[in-house]
């Protein structure tokens, strides 16, 4: 969330470095709590470096397997400790492998810009 400088009335949005550090710390916590995690990372404006005031954080998780529907998977992820608003997309490993084979705009974008903060050797 925006931070106010002590000697200024101007709000300053968290930098890419600040957000990256927070994501890496959050990742370490998630990996400890969720052994099913295969990969965690982020994409979008913070990954590309073109973030600005109001930018949110786009997270991506790959888990071994899940019985939850795709639409409900993100509900149980606590994103409140991150310095900007965030959303997470959660894929099962088979879904992720299937996505990686496709030549869609989204798949190409993830391949080129995702910043992975955790990758389990599979």
Residue ranges, per PLM feature:
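Catalytic core of pol beta-like nucleotidyltransferases
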Residues: 1-39, 47-54, 63-122
């Amino acid at each position: 969330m925006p931070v106010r400088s002590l000697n200024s009335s101007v709000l300053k949005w968290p930098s890419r470095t600040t957000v990256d550090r927070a994501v890496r710390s959050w990742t370490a916590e998630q990996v400890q709590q969720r052994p099913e995690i295969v990969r965690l990372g982020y994409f979008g404006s913070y990954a590309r470096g073109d973030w600005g005031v109001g930018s949110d954080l786009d997270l991506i998780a790959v888990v071994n397997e899940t019985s939850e529907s795709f639409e409900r998977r993100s509900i149980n992820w606590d994103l409140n400790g991150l310095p900007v608003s965030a959303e997470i997309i959660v894929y099962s490993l088979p879904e992720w492998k299937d996505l990686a084979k496709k030549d869609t705009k989204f798949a190409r974008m993830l391949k080129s810009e995702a910043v992975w903060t955790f990758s389990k050797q599979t």
